[in-house]
Amino acid sequence: LAHPATPNDEGSLLARLAEGLGSGNLDHRIFNRDFSDAAVAEPFAMPLADIEQADAIILFGTNIRHELPLLHQRIRKANTHRNAKVYAVNPVDFDFAFSLAGKQIVAPSKLANALEDATLIDAVKGATRPVLIVGALAENHPQAASLRAAARKFAAATGAALCRIPQGANAVGLARNGMLPAKRDVVGMFAE
């Protein structure tokens, strides 16, 4: 197991070492619990700076102020300078430094269904540059695969750019460098 902040060169060497030893038991997704959709970290669907140009932003399962303060600031800028409408769908009523056009505070088991809310979908459908940001609470949820599926469905229905926050400083780099299981994932390794 490697921490998701491990540098690319170390992750790549570890992956090659594991392969040379005949082991496919390696992973960097130490915070994830649901691997049923074999999800890995991926780059945002748009450049980070472009989020300031969004006119509708949906925060899904994230305390963005804590997870990525720089992104929180860009959302604040979009909200205050461009009047972007920001919506939050979370299990906790987090404090943000920008105003929310709407929020749904739901039980963790109801997060996936919250994105099916017709009012939220209609509000976002009218936007020209909508963005859906999926955070740690969704990515590390016990049913994260269903939450990711709900996020993909919502993004497709509304035309929103899907931006999943990587769960580690170098999670995208490690995924690209092969630091992924060929056999057992993190949950499987700990179960043994």
For each feature predicted by the language model, list its residue ranges.
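Catalytic alpha/large subunits of respiratory electron-transfer oxidoreductases
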Residues: 1-192
